[in-house]
Amino acid sequence: MKDNESIRSPGIATGLVTDIGTGNLSRRAFLARLAILAGGSAVVMACGTQATAIAPSRTSASTAKPRPAATTEAAASEEAMIESGPVEFEADGRTLLGYLSRPVLPGPHPGVLLVHENRGLLPHFLDVTRRLAREGYVTLAVDMLSRKGGTDSFADTGAMLSALRGIPTDQIVEDGNAGVRYLQDQPYVDRSRVGAMGFCFGGGIVWRMAVGNPELRAAVPFYGSAPTLEDVSNLQVPVLGIYAGADARINAGVPGLESALKAEGKIFRFVSYPGANHAFFNDTGSRYHPQAAGEAWLETLEWFEDHLMDS
């Protein structure tokens, strides 16, 4: 699949065979994606590949279930590869809160700014920062409720949603950009290789950061509302847009956005997962879709590898 095209993911297993057969998917990406499929014998038979010869090369997207006892030692070793914890930094005279995960190796490493959903910086997003750190990225999740006391100051998610609605979008975008600058200032981050990803509300924020912050090197908005189309001409960031096939509200804005991106010759790729709904990546929510989440995670890692890790 070339950049500046959009695709619908067809049942995932069938799509993998089609993509590798037509040269749209590298063998490395094919093997990594095949490793997450359960019951993928049809793919193995079609490609003449032995399933036992395939080992997952990337972190699984699902952490909803506890690890089996047999993997406890491996999990401990994996966690020893990263350091994680809360951070604070200044922006416009205010203290912003966040959670940062990074590889223990000295680096410098590429960085990723993560923007949470519209319910605050909940544990799921802390986990995503750790997953990315295990892949080699210094990852900062900014608490976009910092100006209201922080996520931990709210008793329930309804109050978090209400508080976020009370913060101007431009302010939230600027707080995201402040997080990018904080990452760039860290000695273990390569300031020239910083990207952003976000989910739901955070996906929309990442789109707005992408059209306004030329220092970003890659962006991955998950089911985020489209930016103002007039701003698309300002985009200097390669964007991977992840969408859910059953997400009618967000998908209504995709055709116009896609047309604007193509007209401006921008680097982008859109992937949609039929049968998945808005927020399908969140493994703590009722709409979690394990297969779509796993595939979207590998798409994300491939995008960041191409535009952050290998650049």
Predicted regions and their residues:
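N-terminal secretory signal peptides
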Residues: 1-29, 38-41
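N-terminal cap/lid segment of alpha/beta-hydrolase-fold proteins
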Residues: 66-104
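Short beta-strand element of the alpha/beta-hydrolase
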Residues: 108-117
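Short amphipathic alpha-helix adjacent to the substrate-entry channel of hydrolases
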Residues: 123-147
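Gly/Ser-rich "nucleophile elbow"/oxyanion-hole loop immediately N-terminal to the catalytic nucleophile
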Residues: 155-197, 307-310
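Primarily recognizes the serine-hydrolase "nucleophile elbow" in alpha/beta-hydrolase
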Residues: 178-236
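Short beta-strand/loop motif that positions the catalytic acidic residue
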Residues: 241-243
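C-terminal catalytic histidine-bearing segment of alpha/beta-hydrolase fold enzymes
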Residues: 267-311
